[in-house]
Amino acid sequence: MSMLREVGIDEAGRGPVIGSLFVAGVLNFEGLEALGVRDSKRLSPKRREQLAKLIEDATEVQVVELTAREIDERRKSQTMNEITVDLFARIIGLLHPDRVYVDAADVNPERFAYNIRKRCNSNMHNIEIIAEFKADVNYPVVSAASIVAKVHRDRSIRELAAEIGTEIGSGYPADPRTIQFLKRLLNDHKDKNSIPAYVRRSWKTVERLCHKAYLYTHD
């Protein structure tokens, strides 16, 4: 009798105004819970890096990335929830699970699970999808996916800052370092469409800063 393939899926980077969105899927394995992956948000960045390597060495892991430019293009016809559903379904298609645990990115977890299933290939419509709030705390396999996704995003932000050659903060709108960087960046550009591709131009934060800087914006 074959072992049930259980997969946890989570994302990192839905809300930032800078950088990519990452979604990770992790296949459950014996010994995962013993690694201490629960409540990943309380882990230090160094510990997350260590755990991500242990997880990626121990089991099947898939990570998909959607760049800021791709997010802007998709948002012309999709909501962020719909985009997230598509990426979660893509992970399912890569890992072929029997049961999936996901951190609900919708106010209605049942609807989120239904929409993911609907976006899966027809031969995967019968898989069990369990969507819950705080699944990254309640299920170690989702905690593991959260760790992997966050490590990939953090690494991407570090690489971007090194490439630009300046401090950009975390990329989140609530980070004063990120806002200061965006203000300096917007002063160097004549209109919104000339802003570098690593900035999510469709974000309200950018619209607001453009308006304050008296920049010409257009669709």
Indicate where each model-derived feature is located.
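RNase H-like, Mg2+-dependent phosphodiesterase core
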Residues: 1-219
